[in-house]
């Protein structure tokens, strides 16, 4: 099986990189298939303070850069190609990319998930420049500033409360007249003196020249439009969007079992419903999506893939 890899990994975020590292260290012929953007969501994170052992000056790109170095040190092959189709029906799995076709004994799907966008003008252009989708990652950049949180579910309210530890004022902007978060979470939120609420309101536009400088909001009931401008002493403010995630699972739809929201269910060993196919990182059904959990998933998936190969392909 000269042209067949032992392990092929789709996705090059922390989960995919960790899987490649563990696969290569185990002397598996390992292929890391990267899309056009290496590193996943973490590359837009300025600082990574919650990854165990990270140095104070660690950034998302620097952490990913070190992971890439380790992957190369242990001999994993890296190919930049967008996988457009997969065939998991046979013992040897086939992955079809824009640049070529790849075959492997085991496949690890680590395609990740993307935060849902608010969908207003200026959002994409100012992501990482005041617009964020991760309070844990970026809260301290808004120390003693004003912050707006878009959303009204559990995550939005919990992240808003976390942000009150840093910001002087946090305003939850919710399109409905009441929160969707669990009652216990709401009770805590309403007792927090630094939390404010804009009901029946949506964000219409985010403005700024290289940094968030103002935001336009519209009341869905009255039609009233208001614009918040960054206080002169701050120069900017934060906009955190928490309206859910979109799993990047279109590639495996109809090929693997997905839950009702599009995530891949696995067991504790990262096994999917298809023999020889594993899933790791944010694409999985899981309770916490962080760099540390993604790398753990990747490590487990690679180790289990190795065991699967040794059992099924034993000479």
Swiss-Prot record:
This is Thioredoxin reductase. FAD binds at residues 34-41, 282-291. GO terms for molecular function: thioredoxin-disulfide reductase (NADPH) activity. Disulfide bonds join 134-137. GO terms for biological process: removal of superoxide radicals. The keyword Signal does not apply. It comes from Peptoclostridium litorale (Clostridium litorale). It is found in: Cytoplasm. InterPro entries: FAD/NAD-bd_sf, FAD/NAD-binding_dom, Ferredoxin-NADP_redctase_2, Pyr_nucl-diS_OxRdtase_2_AS, Thioredox_Rdtase. Keywords: Cytoplasm, Disulfide bond, FAD, Flavoprotein, NADP, Oxidoreductase, Redox-active center. Transmembrane segments: none annotated. The gene is trxB. It is an enzyme of class 1 (oxidoreductase). Its EC number is 1.8.1.9.
């Amino acid at each position: 099986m000269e042209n067949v890899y032992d392990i092929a990994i789709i996705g090059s975020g922390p989960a995919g990189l960790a899987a490649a590292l563990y696969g290569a260290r185990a002397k598996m012929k390992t292929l890391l298939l990267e899309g056009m953007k290496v590193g996943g969501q973490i590359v837009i994170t300025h600082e990574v303070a919650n990854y165990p052992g990270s140095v104070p000056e660690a950034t998302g790109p620097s952490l990913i850069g070190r992971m890439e170095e380790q992957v190369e040190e242990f001999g994993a092959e890296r190919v930049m190609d967008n996988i457009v189709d997969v065939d998991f029906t046979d013992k040897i799995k086939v992955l079809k990319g824009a640049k070529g076709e790849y075959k492997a004994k085991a496949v690890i799907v680590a395609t990740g998930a993307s935060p849902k966008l608010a969908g207003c003008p200026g959002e994409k252009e100012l992501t990482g420049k005041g617009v964020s989708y991760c309070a844990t990652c970026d809260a301290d950049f808004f120390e003693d500033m004003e912050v707006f949180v878009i959303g009204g579910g559990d995550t939005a309210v919990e992240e808003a409360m976390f942000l009150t530890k840093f910001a002087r004022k946090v305003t939850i902007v919710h399109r409905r007249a009441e929160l969707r978060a669990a009652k216990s979470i709401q009770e805590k939120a309403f007792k927090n003196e630094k939390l404010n609420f804009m009901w029946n309101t949506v964000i219409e536009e985010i403005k700024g020249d290289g940094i968030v400088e103002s935001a336009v909001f519209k009341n869905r009931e009255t039609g009233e439009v208001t614009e918040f401008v960054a206080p002169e002493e701050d120069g900017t403010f934060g906009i955190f969007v928490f309206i859910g995630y979109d799993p990047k699972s279109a590639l495996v739809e109809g090929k693997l079992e997905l839950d009702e929201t599009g995530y891949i269910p696995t067991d504790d060993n990262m096994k999917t419903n298809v023999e020889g196919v594993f899933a790791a990182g944010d694409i999985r059904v899981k309770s916490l999506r962080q760099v540390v959990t993604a790398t753990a998933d990747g490590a487990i998936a690679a180790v289990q893939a190795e065991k699967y190969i040794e059992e099924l392909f034993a000479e």
